[in-house]
Amino acid sequence: SVWAQQGYAVCVVDADRNRSATAYGARGLLGFDVVPVEAAAKATRSAQIVITDGQASSHEDELKNLSAGSDIVVLPTTPQARSVELTIEMSAILRGFGIRHAALLVKVDTRKQRFADEARDTLEGFGLEVLDGSIPLLAAFDKAEVQGVTVREAVDDKGRSDPRRMMGWAAYCAAANQLQAILKTDSADNLAA
């Protein structure tokens, strides 16, 4: 949604078995297309940015197929141990395929920042690139999903703007900006080579 707000043509391809992104997109107006993987070939033709929402899986063929042609794969990772372990497993597979990837810490409870710091240290200790910021755990994200809007537009039960929504929006803006910087650096490096 950050890139759509910046004027890019964005398409989210829902490759997750539970079709959560498609359901989210059907609830409201997100400002970008959300399509099931079966419709991706046609729907992504005019997109400048294609985001694939896939299921967390360490199945090699599935990861290879979903990440083929990607400029970068972002691995959303909660600070919980199993999520960190799964990200490390997926990273090893992606590294074996030579696919650029980075972890993004999500659902970070600011009251328990120590767990996020430990997760970051563990991921970096295994050689993973971890995006600088993290996405906070906020009720505004749940409200936005129910309403079918971006977190920036989330409102409470009385129709008032959720007071913490901009904290979530700012976190996604920072992650999007860092991803753009990474891709620009990669592009410049490829041109120089």
Regions found by a protein language model. Name each.
Residues 9-10, 50, 73, 100-102, ...:
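Hydrophobic anchor at the start of a short beta-strand
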Residues 69-88, 109-112:
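Conserved Switch II/interswitch segment of TRAFAC-class P-loop GTPases
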Residues 78, 101-117, 133-145:
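G-domain G4 guanine-recognition motif of GTPases
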Residues 119-155:
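Beta-strand-loop-alpha "switch" segments that mediate conformational coupling across diverse proteins
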Residues 84-110:
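Conserved C-terminal guanine-recognition region of P-loop GTPase G domains, centered on the G4
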Residues 143-173:
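Inter-lobe coupling/hinge region of RecA-like P-loop helicase motors
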Residues 1-68, 145-156:
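P-loop/Walker-type NTP enzyme "switch/lid" segment
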